């Protein structure tokens, strides 16, 4: 793809998300979603092959369906309230429809089927945009309308997402699918706390984007897309592979890494609201995610596969595509757990 075209598309994607973030009118919000969707489809097809075309088509059909449901909900809400203001959600049916539309855009269960397939069909850098930046706009809209959301519906979908995100990743060997199921599980944690403490959900989103971005950047540096190629990276880039191990454990939520912080704060907040069964189930289901992160960590750095002497002398060209943001992102995604008391105080 032409670099100028790619830059224009990225600017359009960011503009669409910014419109959703800044608008208080339903029509402008819908327009921002459509701008975002139409700009990211060529980005998904950056490497032109049948897999990427199939992934872009699946993404388009899912997002278009979600947009139609969103427009229907907006019309119903406007008919009942007589206003186009986002904060004015008076109709319960409109609220449920908007929730379903945004959940479909986010890829939460039971509307999660497109996420692993689309992520697997695109390149690593397109997958990075898909699993990080594309989550901002729907979550920001949920953040704006959280007082009128159906708590039971959100909690059911969040628990289902955490369970499917754990079970789905257990038998995967493709790293992009594993990251997709990881994204589904993390979205479940964010949605669970949305109606209780939306600021905590926002903090969870920031930490999730940081951890996922650092993991994808490390995968891009090593050009690895499967567990087999991941197991051979230690001979080539031991330092990068060690950073990958730490990032994986942080994604799994092991203390004393950053990923433990949002889980800790969400469980604490749910417990404060006299909800004990839900955080217990969420904690148990999170062990499924931790298992396949540990499996990746084990095959990456904790063991050496039987190899011939030739592969132990592997070499590769110096990677010139390392972004300057990689090191700060890795630092943030692994070492800010000591700031938790400060964040609890601010919260």
Swiss-Prot record:
It is a multi-pass membrane protein. InterPro entries: Complex_I_Subunit_2 (IPR050175), NADH_DH_su2_C (IPR010933), NADH_UbQ_OxRdtase_chain2 (IPR003917), ND/Mrp_TM (IPR001750). Its EC number is 7.1.1.2. It catalyses: a ubiquinone + NADH + 5 H(+)(in) = a ubiquinol + NAD(+) + 4 H(+)(out). It comes from the Eukaryota. Keywords: Electron transport, Membrane, Mitochondrion, Mitochondrion inner membrane, NAD, Respiratory chain, Translocase, Transmembrane, Transmembrane helix, Transport, Ubiquinone. GO terms for biological process: mitochondrial electron transport, NADH to ubiquinone; mitochondrial respiratory chain complex I assembly. The chain crosses the membrane at residues 3-23, 25-45, 59-79, 96-116, 127-147, 149-169, 178-198, 201-221, 239-259, 274-294, 326-346. One of its GO terms (molecular function) is NADH dehydrogenase (ubiquinone) activity. The keyword NAD applies. GO terms for cellular component: mitochondrial inner membrane. Core subunit of respiratory chain NADH dehydrogenase (Complex I) which is composed of 45 different subunits. Interacts with TMEM242. PANTHER family: NADH-UBIQUINONE OXIDOREDUCTASE CHAIN 2 (PTHR46552:SF1). Belongs to the complex I subunit 2 family. This is NADH-ubiquinone oxidoreductase chain 2. It comes from Sylvisorex ollula (Greater forest shrew).
């Amino acid at each position: 793809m032409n670099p100028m075209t790619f830059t224009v598309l990225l600017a359009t994607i960011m503009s669409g998300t910014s419109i959703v973030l800044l608008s208080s009118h339903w029509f402008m919000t819908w327009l921002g979603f459509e701008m975002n969707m139409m700009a990211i489809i060529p980005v998904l097809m950056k490497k032109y092959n049948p897999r990427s075309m199939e992934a872009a088509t699946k993404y388009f059909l899912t997002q278009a369906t979600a947009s139609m449901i969103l427009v229907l909900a907006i019309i119903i809400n406007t008919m009942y309230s007589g206003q186009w203001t986002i904060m004015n959600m008076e109709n319960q049916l409109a609220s449920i429809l908007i929730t379903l539309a945004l959940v479909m855009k986010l890829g939460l269960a039971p509307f999660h089927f497109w996420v692993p397939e689309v992520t697997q069909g695109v390149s690593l850098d397109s997958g990075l945009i898909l699993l990080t930046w594309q989550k901002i706009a729907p979550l920001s809209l949920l953040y704006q309308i959280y007082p009128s959301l159906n708590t039971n519906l959100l909690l059911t979908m969040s628990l289902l997402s955490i369970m499917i995100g754990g079970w789905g990743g257990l038998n995967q060997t493709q790293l992009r699918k594993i990251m997709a199921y990881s994204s589904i599980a993390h979205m479940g944690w964010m949605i669970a706390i949305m109606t209780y403490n939306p600021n905590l959900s926002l903090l969870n989103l920031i930490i999730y984007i940081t951890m996922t971005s650092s993991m994808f950047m490390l995968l891009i540096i090593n050009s690895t897309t499967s567990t087999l190629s991941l197991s051979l990276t230690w001979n080539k880039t031991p330092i990068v592979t060690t950073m990958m191990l730490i990032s994986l454990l942080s994604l799994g939520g092991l203390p004393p890494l950053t990923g433990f912080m949002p889980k800790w704060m969400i469980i604490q907040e749910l417990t404060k609201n006299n909800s004990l069964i839900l955080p217990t189930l969420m904690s148990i289901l999170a062990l499924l995610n931790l298992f396949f992160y540990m499996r990746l960590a084990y095959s990456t750095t904790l063991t050496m596969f039987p190899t011939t002497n030739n592969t132990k002398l592997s070499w590769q060209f110096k990677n010139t595509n390392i972004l300057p943001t990689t090191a700060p992102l890795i630092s943030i995604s692994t070492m800010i757990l000591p700031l938790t008391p400060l964040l609890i105080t601010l919260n």
